[in-house]
Amino acid sequence: MCGRFLRRLLAEESRRSTPVGRLLLPVLLGFRLVLLAASGPGVYGDEQSEFVCHTQQPGCKAACFDAFHPLSPLRFWVFQVILVAVPSALYMGFTLYHVIWHWELSGKGKEEETLIQGREGNTDVPGAGSLRLLWAYVAQLGARLVLEGAALGLQYHLYGFQMPSSFACRREPCLGSITCNLSRPSEKTIFLKTMFGVSGFCLLFTFLELVLLGLGRWWRTWKHKSSSSKYFLTSESTRRHKKATDSLPVVETKEQFQEAVPGRSLAQEKQRPVGPRDA
């Protein structure tokens, strides 16, 4: 029973998405998580401890580091992943509710075969529940697109594309301009650009998924209208042909045939007396 329920849930999750949404977006999300977990702490774990300022003024180093990084890049990326995953989690919860509701409605899941087979057919034919799921999927893609774009803009505003090797600090309680140095700026720059590229690909593929969904829906609508018009023309032609056929008399015997043909028969024409006009 659990296996059938999971198959139905997975089928309902993937029936509205394209290969981009089924494969590329989850792979990029998993790659981002692995990259953060495996390399993030090693690259940015020492950013505060190795942040060296040329001063002995108490509190100056902490104030300069706060001015240089108001938000740690590692914490920013973790927050970004969680924030981007929220729309997908909400959509999965909505789909789970939809599947449970239909599961209880169908009793023992008799609609499983129809649901799985429906992935190969037209997915816009089902009723209002399927349409709500489709719009929920589009809404979560739109939310992810907005969140990814906002995160990319905020990342560029906070960190730019390159991690500098030194930073000139002018903050209290520092006396004048203080120069601070960072450890391994090149490694941090490479990781910063990598995370920027992964976020850019996620943004691009999310937009591509929306475009493919729109094109697919337009194609199915056009195909449905085309098939409907062909069916209407065929039905109209058949109706007219049937009407024309029904208007003709049904000939069953020779006498009925002779009555149906306008004028007289050949035998009656021979028996007609010859008048002066015929002579």
Curated annotation (Swiss-Prot):
Example GO molecular function: identical protein binding
Membrane-spanning residues: 23-43, 76-96, 133-153, 195-215
Gene3D superfamilies: Gap junction channel protein cysteine-rich domain (1.20.1440.80)
GO biological process, alphabetically ordered: cell-cell signaling; myelination; sensory perception of sound
GO cellular component: connexin complex; myelin sheath
Cytoplasmic side, ranges: 1-22, 97-132, 216-279
Highest taxon of the lineage: Eukaryota
Record-linked InterPro entries: Connexin (IPR000500), Connexin_CCC (IPR019570), Connexin_CS (IPR017990), Connexin_N (IPR013092), Connexin_N_sf (IPR038359)
Segments in the Extracellular topological domain: 44-75, 154-194
Region called Disordered, residue ranges: 238-279
Entries under SMART domains matching the protein: CNX, Connexin_CCC
Record-stated family: Belongs to the connexin family. Gamma-type subfamily.
Binding partners and assembly: A connexon is composed of a hexamer of connexins.
Function of the molecule: One gap junction consists of a cluster of closely packed pairs of transmembrane channels, the connexons, through which materials of low MW diffuse from one cell to a neighboring cell.
Name under which the protein is recorded: Gap junction gamma-3 protein
Biological source species: Homo sapiens (Human)
Gene assigned in the entry: GJC3
